[in-house]
Amino acid sequence: MKFELKTTDGRARRGQLVFERGTVQTPAFMPVGTYGTVKGMTPEEVRETGAQILLGNTFHLWLRPGQEVMRAHGDLHDFMNWQGPILTDSGGFQVFSLGHIRKITEAGVHFRHPINGEKIFLDPEKSMEIQYDLGSDIVMIFDECTPYPATYEEARKSMEMSLRWGKRSRDKFDALGNKNALFGIIQGSVYEDLRDVSLDGLLEIGFDGYAVGGLAVGEPKEDMHRILEHVCPKIPADKPRYLMGVGKPEDLVEGVRRGIDMFDCVMPTRNARNGHLFTTDGVVKIRNAKYREDTSTLDADCDCYTCKNYTRSYLYHLDKCNEILGARLNTIHNLRYYQRVMQGLRDAIEQGKLDDFVTEFYRRQGKPVPPLAENDVK
């Protein structure tokens, strides 16, 4: 993988990630394909929304279908018939999400299979092996996602263990002869000095890109913005920056304003299945009875298949009848909306008009523009 930075506007960056499997324009949003599928969508449909890279889930793909099945197909690209780049998370966040049914030690994580109760162990070395079999274009180190809230001491211990796991991940990745990219993950909760220690430790190990982890886990938005404003300028400019698990459309905008290049989130797909649709003028909750006879287009500014062919009334009807097509059409739209936001951000940065884009984005959403830290203002 090669990262090329083309231009900047304030702290926002316009670049591209070059892989053997294709080039990804940044800032980029990665749809989440947990089990080797973006729910309800064919790979061709996902690509038509504008997506150039997907996220796969190491933890879930390890449990089902397993490494043997993946190896029999070649890798995840062949298994799911997506020939573009794929980033896989390490499984750390999913293990963190298991809560009481897992035990974290220095060696790794002991937990019970969430489906059959079988005892399982996952560590940095195993995570690297799984991601090697998946053929991931971007591999993430195995880390502990620090819960929120965490005391300073809890956050420090968690971050330090993640650093040690990061070194083990790097060593195993290299031992496997993996020629793809490996990203480090910056931890430290809401404490700036711990984030600094984490980044310094990761830089010493050396990675192809750096993710900001442990955010969007319940902390106030102000804390997320503060940490991004603190951390992003310290990440080497020639390395891509990835904000994990984020977020709402406005979170993408705010991340880009602060220097983030990559995002992923289940929100556009999960919310679509629940009738929660993102539009240029704000959220449409299509289950609301006021849409029963609404013959207007979902989003007049959108060029997706759904908006070009169907009315809000029809989408309301499909949802009311629990028709599978409803979830599919909603997903097509939400994913296209997210990609249109990213395209708008990329174009604005290229033209040196990011402030204008941000102002118009929030005006249409009916929200005030969140302030940047003083040292972030051009």
Swiss-Prot record:
Catalysed reaction(s)?
7-aminomethyl-7-carbaguanine + guanosine(34) in tRNA = 7-aminomethyl-7-carbaguanosine(34) in tRNA + guanine
Task: List, from the UniProt record, the residues annotated as the active site of this protein.
Answer: 89, 264
Kindly state one GO CC term assigned in the UniProt record: cytosol
List positions binding substrate: 89-93, 143, 187, 214
What does the note under cofactor report? Binds 1 zinc ion per subunit.
Q: Look at the named UniProt entry and state the broad enzyme category this protein falls under.
A: transferase
Q: What is its EC number?
A: 2.4.2.29
The record ties this protein, via InterPro entries, to:
ArchSynthase1/Queuine_TRR, TGT, TGT-like_sf, tRNA_ribo_trans-like
Fetch the Pfam families from UniProt.
TGT
Q: To which pathway does this protein belong?
A: tRNA modification; tRNA-queuosine biosynthesis
User: Which cofactor is recorded for it?
Assistant: Zn(2+)
Give me the ranges of the annotated region RNA binding: 245-251, 269-273
* Record's keyword terms, sorted: Glycosyltransferase, Metal-binding, Queuosine biosynthesis, Transferase, tRNA processing, Zinc
Q: Which GO terms describe its biological process?
A: queuosine biosynthetic process; tRNA wobble guanine modification; tRNA-guanine transglycosylation
Binding-site list for Zn(2+): 302, 304, 307, 333
GO molecular-function terms, A-Z = metal ion binding; tRNA-guanosine(34) queuine transglycosylase activity
What does this protein do, in the record's words? Catalyzes the base-exchange of a guanine (G) residue with the queuine precursor 7-aminomethyl-7-deazaguanine (PreQ1) at position 34 (anticodon wobble position) in tRNAs with GU(N) anticodons (tRNA-Asp, -Asn, -His and -Tyr). Catalysis occurs through a double-displacement mechanism. The nucleophile active site attacks the C1' of nucleotide 34 to detach the guanine base from the RNA, forming a covalent enzyme-RNA intermediate. The proton acceptor active site deprotonates the incoming PreQ1, allowing a nucleophilic attack on the C1' of the ribose to form the product.
What protein family is recorded?
Belongs to the queuine tRNA-ribosyltransferase family.
Quaternary structure annotation from Swiss-Prot or TrEMBL: Homodimer. Within each dimer, one monomer is responsible for RNA recognition and catalysis, while the other monomer binds to the replacement base PreQ1.
Name-wise, this protein is Queuine tRNA-ribosyltransferase
